[in-house]
Amino acid sequence: MTALAGLLAFSQAARIRAQQAGDSGSLELVDPDVFRACGDPRNMPFSNEKGEGFENKLAELLAAKLGKKLSYAYFPQATGFVRMTLGFFRCDVIMGFPQGDDQAQLTIPYYRTTYALIVKQGSGLEDVATIADPRLKDKRIGVVARTPPSTVMAMNGLLAHAKSYPLFVDTRADSSAQAMLDDLASGEIDCGILWGPMAGYYAARANPPLVMVPLVKETAAAPMTFRIGMAVRPSDQEWKRTLNRLIKENQAEINKLLISYNIPILDESNAPITAETLSKEP
């Protein structure tokens, strides 16, 4: 069966199910038996083809809660990712997507995180809280181009000594995060600023481990903290409600999963959510 024929057959079956259910007009092409997630094939700590990322594990958890089988469609998370995955019906949910991005419809957020500074132990930068800290003036800082930290660095006159890494790469061949960590280890840069999940994951696995400082005290105009949910097609309203329910019912377990990957997660007052704070909850 060709891919097109398969899609048409799936579409026809969905139409029949919708009619049998007394559907009022909106058509949802969500597989009733398979939790069809999509992600990047090589983008740890989020996902990889071996199923080792926290988004992979979250998909496993939610599939089990629904009693569904799990399947994954992989595509490099660069330009065209949403269109090539959700848009072409290769999957029914993108497991991690920032609020405010209008390419797809979002669920409620299941975590909140921020950009973070990563430094070596003994660097004298371990307690830097903002990009405006005078100690960064003469430092060579690694930063991913066209991200909020690069905007704040420009506002503070820090780009002259910065080393820039590309925002969009084919993750099957390159990793800006790993390149930054390698440069920090070799002394090519003095510190780096990464998206929080990457900063936490890679800092914990470095040898020796690096210090991660979430930039929660940053007061510049560019937003540094974001809520992350899941993305579905705009037509899939009932599916979105199902995912919202699952997130609410399993938030504590989701938090534990994120913490196990050293992801810096924050509550709405920017206080860190840690294993210790979770243990104190009733």
Describe every region a protein language model picked out.
Residues 1-3:
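N-terminal export leaders
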Residues 68-69, 86-96, 139-140, 179-180, ...:
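Alpha-to-beta junction loops
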Residues 40-41, 112-124, 204-247, 263-282:
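Periplasmic-binding protein-like
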